[in-house]
Curated annotation (Swiss-Prot):
InterPro entries: Smg. PANTHER family: PROTEIN SMG. This is Protein Smg homolog. Belongs to the Smg family. The gene is smg. Pfam families: DUF494. It comes from the Bacteria. Transmembrane segments: none annotated.
Amino acid sequence: MFDILVYLFENYFDTGNYPDSATLTRKLTMAGFDDEEITLALDWLSEFSHHDTEGYLAGLAESNSMRHFTKEEMEIIDTEGRGFIFFLEQAGVINPLQRELLIDRVIRMDGDTSSVEKIKLVVLFDLWIQNQLADSNTIEKLFVVSDSHQRH
């Protein structure tokens, strides 16, 4: 699924939107992706674009409490990934509500790709869907700064 999401971002980012599900399925099949993986990716993307925050506490976006990861979350999101999420929140890229949505979305992804790669992709999709990637420097700032942060 990760490869499909990367493919979609790389091929549709510049256009600002992506085609309907049937067209995407056809194009992804022609690109050689597996039908089951296509379905998983498109379902994940559909859920992602709805920004359902109903199950989260009111006022979470303004919260300044410390987040502790559950055992299950720590099994899926490694130390580097958790550190990157903390970095994004401290840098003001995401608020606590966006952090929770990010964690949920990363957990819903499958595969053996590193957590940081998944997290970066989810953040890119979130910013893309919210039309916050209009400034091409946003991507560079996010990833250059985060990469230098992780080297320390």
